[in-house]
Amino acid sequence: MAVTDKAEVVIIGSGVIGNAAAYYMAKRGASVIVLEGSEIIGNGGSSRNGGGVRQSARDPRELPLVMYAVENLWPGLSDELGMDVEYCKKGNLRLGKGEAHRKILQGLCDRSTAQGLDVRMLDGDEVREINPYLSDEVTCASWCPTDGHANPLRTTLAYYRAARQLGVRFYTRELATGLIMDKGRLRYVKTACGDLFEGDTILVAAGYASRALLHTVGIDIPMNKVLLEAIVTEAEPPMFEQMLGTAPADFYGHQTPHGSFVFGGHTGMEPYFGEYASDGLNPSQAISAPTAARAILNFFPRLQNTKLVRTWAGSMDECADKVPVMDRPAEVPGLSIACGFTGHGFGIAPAAGLLLSELVLDGKASTLSLEEFRYDRFAPV
């Protein structure tokens, strides 16, 4: 079978992780191909999230990556990529009601401060000094002044555009269906179109779709597919610049520079989708978005008369231990993996892309360690 195209690196998945990795590899002079199964760049979770650039409440294994990104990469990203990614570093309030929420937030604070992050607990009055629009029912919050948010779609497209300018070749509508070994090494990617792509290294960064694809070479990443809801409101006068979240993690969001609010969250209503779909209704609009909206109003009643402009849902690749896999498994030479980001990959995307470029091109990440993200952590004991 004739090879359609070949490069040093073939990346499967044109989300923010894949595009960032492609950019940093091309910046070092590598030839790179990126394959995207849909016709739209960033069609998965990369364009369907709340845009949080969050250090607080991170798993300790991820915290060094996002702290590095916030300190060294996010501040200059718009200038570097030549496109405004709307990065705003105005802090993050994780809100709570009552003692149970306070205990959750205090535990998250203690875990983060132990690694050097500036995050602290506030009482209800202190919270409303920062954001006076919040409900009086808010009794506490964690506050990280160096957290923030950015525009996920613009960030994904900025990496895409900058990578193209460096010579990266993007192929849309090329759904990867299998990985093919040659002489004991992974060498080829076949697609649903019948095309064949060749690379010295294949980086699988296709979200939940990575699991089935990796099965073709005997690798299994324990992931689940979890639906996330996102809603966008009409524009309102400027109210606040912080990123918001909650102790029970039922929603997160922020106000954009344009005035609209972007919120996201996991409603857990998927088991009921079939009932609504059978009645000819859009399950996202009929049940999931209203559930998310009610959660938001419990904390933010000032938005009760604000109209929703649109809603959408997208799936995330939830890894078994809630942190991603970024590795080169020894049992499949030529393979690199970047998946399982569990809905919080956007904030670490610049650091992940940089480290993946080092992993692929040098054999090991050098800026920061990726040892905590190895595939073999799931091996039987």
Model regions: which residues?
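N-terminal Rossmann-like FAD-binding beta1-loop-alpha1 element of flavoenzymes
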Residues: V9-I33
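Central helical "cap/lid" subdomain
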Residues: G42, D195-E241
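Helical element adjacent to the flavin cofactor pocket in flavoenzyme catalytic cores
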Residues: W143-C193, F197-D200
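Active-site lid/adjacent beta-loop-alpha segment flanking the redox-cofactor pocket in flavoenzymes
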Residues: P237-G334
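Glycine-rich FAD pyrophosphate-binding loop
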Residues: A26-S46
